[in-house]
Amino acid sequence: LTCVTGKSIGGISTEECAAGQKICNKKWTKMGPKLYDVSRGCTATCPKADEYGCVKCCNTDRN
C-alpha cells in the first residue's frame, strides 16, 4: 500500500506502508480561524478525531 504523505505545488510525496499498516489516513486539526494542520500517512487502525479536527481513512493506494 502506498499512501500520500504530503501535497504541494511541486506535487505529492508518498510512502510505502510497513507490514500491518493497511490504512491511509489524513487528519486535519484546527489551529485557528481558517488555519489547519494536516498530517497524512500509514496506520494500522483509523485514528479517532479530537474535538478540534477530523480524520479520513481509506485502504486504497494514493488517496
From Swiss-Prot:
<dbReference type="InterPro" id="IPR018354">
    <property type="entry name" value="Snake_toxin_con_site"/>
</dbReference>
<feature type="disulfide bond">
    <location>
        <begin position="46"/>
        <end position="57"/>
    </location>
</feature>
<keyword id="KW-0964">Secreted</keyword>
<protein>
    <recommendedName>
        <fullName>Synergistic-type venom protein C9S3, chain 2</fullName>
    </recommendedName>
</protein>
<feature type="disulfide bond">
    <location>
        <begin position="3"/>
        <end position="24"/>
    </location>
</feature>
<dbReference type="Pfam" id="PF21947">
    <property type="entry name" value="Toxin_cobra-type"/>
</dbReference>
<keyword id="KW-0800">Toxin</keyword>
<dbReference type="InterPro" id="IPR045860">
    <property type="entry name" value="Snake_toxin-like_sf"/>
</dbReference>
<dbReference type="InterPro" id="IPR054131">
    <property type="entry name" value="Toxin_cobra-type"/>
</dbReference>
<feature type="disulfide bond">
    <location>
        <begin position="17"/>
        <end position="42"/>
    </location>
</feature>
<comment type="subunit">
    <text>Heterodimer of C9S3 chain 1 (AC P01408) and chain 2, linked by at least two disulfide bonds.</text>
</comment>
<dbReference type="InterPro" id="IPR003571">
    <property type="entry name" value="Snake_3FTx"/>
</dbReference>
<keyword id="KW-1015">Disulfide bond</keyword>
<dbReference type="GO" id="GO:0005576">
    <property type="term" value="C:extracellular region"/>
</dbReference>
<dbReference type="GO" id="GO:0090729">
    <property type="term" value="F:toxin activity"/>
</dbReference>
<comment type="similarity">
    <text>Belongs to the three-finger toxin family. Short-chain subfamily. Aminergic toxin sub-subfamily.</text>
</comment>
<comment type="function">
    <text>This protein shows a synergetic toxic effect in that it enhances the toxicity of other D.angusticeps toxins.</text>
</comment>
